[in-house]
Amino acid sequence: MPKILLCCAAGMSTSMVVQKMEKAAKVQGIEVEIKAVGIEEFNDEIAHYDCCLLGPQIKYKLADFQPLAQQLNKPISVINSMDYGMMNGEKILNDSLKLIHA
């Protein structure tokens, strides 16, 4: 089962994206575990997930988070701002699964 970590400033807006992603996964018959956290939780959580997606509002943190993600062999990326703004859970889910299987 893929495990996806979403990270934003406080974990609030990404928690809504998580709900949309879980709904999309259910429709597609995919079992996933998705969690939203704030930036202060990234270091403690990344090791337990297959990939991490950052909210577009914290894309500036990508350079800070990449070294640990690479050390742990965890892909990390920034969510497309249009998909994030539209809460396109299906697209974000599919992008995260591609990231895991790349």
Spell out what each predicted region is.
Residues 46-51:
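Short acidic/histidine-rich motifs immediately flanking catalytic phosphotransfer sites
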Residues 56-57:
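Short glycine-/small-residue-rich Rossmann-like dinucleotide-binding loops
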Residues 3, 75-102:
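Ser/Thr/Gly-rich flexible loops in soluble cytosolic domains mediating phosphotransfer, phosphorylation
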Residues 2-39:
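Conserved active-site segments centered on acidic
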Residues 42-44, 86:
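Generic structural signal for helix capping and beta-alpha/helix-loop junctions
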